[in-house]
Amino acid sequence: MLWIEAVRTLSADLEDPFELEFVWRNLHELNKLSWLNLMREKITDQELKLLTEVSKRLHQNEPPQYIVGWAEFRDLKLKVDERVLIPRPETEELVEMILAENEKDSLKILDIGTGSGAIAISLAQARENWSVKASDISKEALTLAAENAEINQANLEFIQSDVLDKITDSFDIIVSNPPYIAFDETYEMDNSVIKYEPDLALFAENQGLAIYQKIADQAVNHLTDNGKIYLEIGYKQGQAVQAIFQEKFTDKLVSIHQDIFGKDRMISVK
């Protein structure tokens, strides 16, 4: 059997048939040309066994990023596993908005619920004069985030904290992509997310609004006079999250921002 025949057979029922190629190429460090050349060769019994195992894991909805052990975020390569969420493209938009609106040197930044460290590491790399701290309730997530910071040569500090419970500083920018999915919304989620990604980073009480409320309650005492808050939100939560923060920050403008698909996806408080 040729490689191309094996790949066609084993990827036929996958939602994204290119996932099999993605995983194999990354596990074996093959570029596109090497992969195409491989397709014309005969597949060995051992290779077929390994390829079948990868296909099986993909058919069980295991995210390809978890199989290869990393994910891309902006220009970063981040280690990921079941301790953290896989970074999403919409979070890149949140980072880009922060960078576009803030160019001043020596700002103090806090990323709440950092997970893999995607937001904090991106900001620390893009603005070397910023002082960036990142917190998470999960010790396991912080361990992985610290590894990612070292891999990507980013200088930042990590703190284990439930939102701002153990934070004492004030910040010029507080950013968060918190858990925001309601427990009764699992029907809208992909099986791969439900089965493999950590519940702690996905779900929140009060129809997904509980962490936003806690951030609003606590950030009042941790924001500088001209400080700003940036948040990622669920696409149905814009008005609810806006109301939570407008109640706490009556002297600031709380705005809803859309992603590239026109869906409510971000909140700014400034």
Swiss-Prot record:
InterPro entries: DNA_methylase_N6_adenine_CS, HemK-like, N5-glutamine_MTase, PrmC_N, RF_methyltr_PrmC, SAM-dependent_MTases_sf, Small_mtfrase_dom
Binding annotation for substrate: N177, P178, P179, Y180
GO molecular function, one term: protein-glutamine N-methyltransferase activity
Keyword Plastid among UniProt keywords: no
Protein's UniProt keywords contain DNA damage: no
Entry's EC annotation: 2.1.1.297
Gene3D superfamilies, alphabetized: DNA helicase RuvA subunit, C-terminal domain (1.10.8.10), Vaccinia Virus protein VP39 (3.40.50.150)
Catalytic reaction(s) noted: L-glutaminyl-[peptide chain release factor] + S-adenosyl-L-methionine = N(5)-methyl-L-glutaminyl-[peptide chain release factor] + S-adenosyl-L-homocysteine + H(+)
Pfam families the UniProt entry points to: MTS, PrmC_N
The entry's keywords: Methyltransferase, S-adenosyl-L-methionine, Transferase
Residues that hold S-adenosyl-L-methionine according to the record: G113, T114, G115, S116, G117, D136, N177
An annotated GO BP: methylation
SS bond list: none
HAMAP family: RF_methyltr_PrmC (MF_02126)
Function noted in UniProt: Methylates the class 1 translation termination release factors RF1/PrfA and RF2/PrfB on the glutamine residue of the universally conserved GGQ motif.
Family: Belongs to the protein N5-glutamine methyltransferase family. PrmC subfamily.
Name of this chain's protein: Release factor glutamine methyltransferase
Origin species: Lactococcus lactis subsp. lactis (strain IL1403)
Lineage: Bacteria, Bacillati, Bacillota, Bacilli, Lactobacillales
Gene name of the record: prmC
